[in-house]
Amino acid sequence: AREKVGIIGYTTKETPVLSNPGPYLEFRDEVEELQIHANKLTTLGVNKIIALGHSGFFEDQRIARKVKGVDVVVGGHTNTFLYTGSPPSTEVPAGNYPFMVQSDDGRQVPVVQAYAFGKYLGYLNVVFNDKGNVIKASGNPILLNKDIPEDQVVKAQVNKMKIQLQNYYSQEIGKTIVYLNGTTQACRFHECNLGNLICDAVIYNNLRHPDDNEWNHVSMCIVNGGGIRSPIDERANNGIITLEELTSVLPFGGTFDLLQIKGSALKQAFEHSVHRHGQGTGELLQVSGIKVVYDLSQKPGSRVVSLNVLCTKCRVPTYVPLEMEKTYKVLLPSFLATGGDGYHMLKGDSSNHNSGDLDISIVGDYIKRMEKVFPAVEGRVTFLDGTLFQAQLFLTWGLCISLLFFIL
């Protein structure tokens, strides 16, 4: 017999700070809005409902607990890897697949994600009873390696497009002799060497002729970890960096702009950088010309222990404490300069904001000039002993709490 299955889409209510959707779209609480539409489907006689969205693993679990009528949650955004048993590749599972959540009304609701980059195909087998409740759920992500046959129709279409793009994207920019760590697990949680490379390139691009007062007009760069989208493996292709790989790292086509702001606003930005550290969100700032120390045991808004910046009005550049009332020049992505990722304190206007060059051009030109790159993790972003460890456990503890809730 045919069965009616309802699918309701959702996306994060944080979209206005993560992207630029314009002024005419309203993003509301996922649970409240999903409940409205689940109720509509229920009145139409649909008793099997899938919530399909992009709000992150914690929100997926909240939806599973709170929304009456939703039987399965298929999520994204945090690129969470779930797997039952021994994983087939290098990703470490954040929990079983499916991740079972007990709803507030006593049902078992499977929650799934399947990592990112098309590396896996999510596979979930669900059995419902006559009332539409899940009585069994099983499966695992399928690793799309060479053992999985390619779809020949899609492959032909892709190959046709690749021919047109191949000459452009296959351009060799330079070489890396170290792993350029641009993973979510690195750049959104602590200092990452690919973030250092990007910001160093931006500073280099903005070097001007020194004068009697300054060795350069700007010494600082910041970039949000969420804007770094992919690593580059030095063991692949003999370490050669192509334009295609660099485009995977910086795919959004933004610019790096020059902003003049007070030290107090910059301090506020660094507090925002870690105000919800440990959740895998993209606010954490990667830097150049800045050294920051955090204490994550303190409450949000009071976590910056020290913030030192590289002097410009000096013959020998050294790090000096940030002055709250002093005006500084900072290089940053255009996304941040328009208040993206919640950085309203960085939002500039025509009086203090100057647009710069395309991000991929800046980094590409720098790598070409250097020929070989080997950026290190240097202690630009550090955490007091023990506090980073606690924050990185936050995701795991969140999973444990949910699992305990289910067991109890």
Curated annotation (Swiss-Prot):
Principal location class: membrane
GO biological process: AMP catabolic process
Glycosylation sites recorded in the entry for this protein: 167, 181
Pfam families per UniProt: 5_nucleotid_C (PF02872)
GO molecular function: ADP phosphatase activity; GMP 5'-nucleotidase activity; metal ion binding; nucleotide binding; toxin activity
Binding annotation for Zn(2+): 54, 77
Summary of pH dependence: Optimum pH is 7.5.
Membrane topology: Lipid-anchor; GPI-anchor
Disulfide bonds: 187-192, 199-221, 311-314
Summary of the function given for this chain in its UniProt record: Hydrolyzes nucleotides into nucleosides. Prefers AMP as the substrate but also cleaves GMP and ADP. Does not affect AMP, cAMP and cGMP. Inhibits ADP- and collagen-induced platelet aggregation. Snake venom 5'-nucleotidases are widely distributed among venomous snake taxa, but there is a lack of information about their biological activities. They have been shown to inhibit platelet aggregation. This effect may be due to the liberation of inhibitory AMP or adenosine by its action on ADP released upon initiation of aggregation.
Identification of the protein by name: Snake venom 5'-nucleotidase
